[in-house]
From Swiss-Prot:
GO terms for molecular function: mitochondrion targeting sequence binding; protein transmembrane transporter activity. Belongs to the Tim17/Tim22/Tim23 family. Keywords: Membrane, Mitochondrion, Mitochondrion inner membrane, Protein transport, Translocation, Transmembrane, Transmembrane helix, Transport. Its main location: mitochondrion. The keyword Ubl conjugation does not apply. It is found in: Mitochondrion inner membrane. It is a multi-pass membrane protein. Component of the TIM22 complex, whose core is composed of tim-22, associated with the 70 kDa heterohexamer. In most cases, the 70 kDa complex is composed of tim-9/tin-9.1 and tim-10/tin-10. One of its GO terms (cellular component) is TIM22 mitochondrial import inner membrane insertion complex. This is Mitochondrial import inner membrane translocase subunit tim-22. The chain crosses the membrane at residues 92-112, 143-161, 188-208. It holds the Pfam family Tim17.
């Protein structure tokens, strides 16, 4: 339209009345073109472009709208997840729980038959409160130490095997039971170590199969 107007004016100047006063031209200034990128272009430039981002001088990242996803984990939740995945933490927790189970088991057996491990005592006489407490404490310490060491060794070995193999299946429990049983039986000799490894491996496999089933 502007081109047609300019052509008409030029034709009038050429072939019009030369004595007629000339009309003043109205010059309309054109605004400079300003490019405003869309949200899609901004996202593409942020991901794979040159990342100039003149519309975002603070360089704040674009966060997608979460619709069907879980919210971000807090700092405390990340710490808990790290602790549950760390072999040292898992082994320590299993050891502490094993000590607690050993204490309870020792207390139960001592309350059922407190004279079971009394050596050199008269079984016909009734035990005093001091003797009963001594028997209970010694048995609780013994069971707690055994159960705690077994839980610590088994959980640590299983976590290490799971990390090395990068798999979480029943073989981790079987291998861990064999290793821990062999180490515990090795104190009595080679054959007890073999039988201990085999028995503990079978027991771990059965328990793992029951828990996973």
């Amino acid at each position: 339209m502007a081109l047609a107007s300019s052509n008409a004016t030029s034709m009038e100047e050429l072939f019009g009345n030369p004595f007629r006063p000339k009309k003043e031209r109205v010059v309309v200034e054109e605004k400079p073109f300003e490019y405003t990128p869309s949200a899609y272009v901004q996202m593409i430039d942020q991901m794979i472009g040159i990342k100039t981002r003149p519309w975002n001088p603070e360089r704040t990242p674009i966060k997608p709208i979460q619709m069907l996803t879980l919210p971000e984990m807090s700092r405390e939740e990340r710490w808990i997840q790290w602790g549950m995945e760390n072999c040292t933490v898992k082994a320590s927790i299993s050891g502490v729980l094993g000590v607690g189970v050993g204490f309870a088991f020792g207390l139960f057996t001592a309350s059922v038959d407190p004279q079971l491990s009394m050596v050199g005592g008269d079984p016909t006489k009734q035990l005093t409160l001091k003797q009963t407490w001594k028997e209970m404490s010694s048995r609780m310490k013994s069971y707690g130490k055994n159960f705690g060491s077994i839980g610590l060794m088994f959980s640590g070995t299983e976590c290490a095997l799971e990390t090395i193999r990068a798999k979480s299946d029943w073989r981790n429990g079987t291998y861990s039971g064999g290793i821990v049983g062999g180490l515990l039986g090795l104190r009595a000799g080679i054959m007890p170590a073999v039988w201990g490894a085999a028995g503990f491996a079978v027991f771990s496999t059965i328990i793992d199969h029951y828990m996973r089933g």
